[in-house]
Amino acid sequence: MLDNNFIYKINSILPADISVNGFNKVQGEANARFGAISREYIYKIHQNKNPFLNNRSLFYKGTINIRLINEACKVLVTSSDFQSFSKVKTEINNFKCVINYARFEKSNDNFNFVISSNRFLRGMVRCIVGTLLEVNEKKISLKEFNKIVENKDRKGAGPSVLASGLYLSKVEYPSSIYI
C-alpha cells in the first residue's frame, strides 16, 4: 500500500526535469511504453529574447504565419508514412504512424506546435518542426512539403530543431489496463 507521501518521496529522488503528478494502479502486464494508444508532444517557440526560456524553448526571430504552417499540418494528418522525418541511421523498418492532430498555436507571446500520434519515430517531431519552419520562411512550398512526405526521403526535409523545446505532454492508455 502506498502512503500519502508517495508522490513527494518519488519526486525527491527524480531528476529536476521529471516529476510525478499522480498515479494509477494497472494490470501486471501493463507496459508504459508499448501499451500507450496515443502520445502528445508540444514543441515550444518564443520570439522575444528571454533568459528564463533559454534551453526550454526555441528562440525564433522570424514572423510566424500560423495559417500557412497549419495548412502544412493538414498534410501530416492525412499521411501515414513518416520516413522523411525519421533519423537516417535507424534499425526500424516501419515508418507508419497515425497522426491524430498537428497544429501551431499562439500562446501569449509564444507559439506551440502540438502533435498527437499513436507512435513517433526517433527525431520525428523535431524534424517536422524544422521543416514546418522552412515552410513558414517560404524555403519550401506547401506543394513541396507534400512531396517531401510522399518521397519518404529524409534528405528532402528541413533540419531538426534543438531538443530543448520538446515536451511529452500527454500519454493515453486503453481503459482495460487499469485496475
Where does each model-flagged region fall?
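Structured-RNA-binding interfaces characteristic of tRNA pseudouridine synthases
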Residues: 1-179
